[in-house]
């Protein structure tokens, strides 16, 4: 029997089969939309123009497969098509951009400085950011005191941005996408306070990022994944 693919149902079936076959050959990213670590992983994949199967999770109901491949239970988690699992957002960014880097985010001229900034973000700024955002869990200092501690890093970024459009020059680097989600989170604790601080260049940089087409794409909303769902290819 010959299948007439002009029939709409048959065409839909063919497209669905093709989508499943495509997803099977792709890496799989477990993600949570609002997590800054997951944001930068998605940005890395977008700038690398590297499609993956995306599985959005809920923190209260983590998929069994995700926990099986990454028992630590935090996102993002990327399982490469060959089965290798990458559990850290920074490593996911780097892996994606090592596959292809059309905009040279990992330019050797700025890579060392970019890595140093990301390290400072992850080890120092994130510490104060968590306490600023969740002051009720960290009562040793006031929220204002925690904010001022975090501002030490913002001052470094402001100084860099007085010279350049982006952190390390006039083009995007891995430092920008690796740090921006955390500055966004800091700003969102109290937007009025953030935009009253003496960091005009940083504020413009953040506003530009929030309007950036790839960031908007990175923040696309997806329904939480369940076993048996039709694959979601990201970017679609």
Model-derived regions, located:
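Acidic carboxylate-rich catalytic motifs and surrounding loops in phosphoryl-/glycosyl-chemistry enzymes
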Residues: 57, 218-224
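GST-like fold's C-terminal all-alpha helical module
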Residues: 117, 121-211
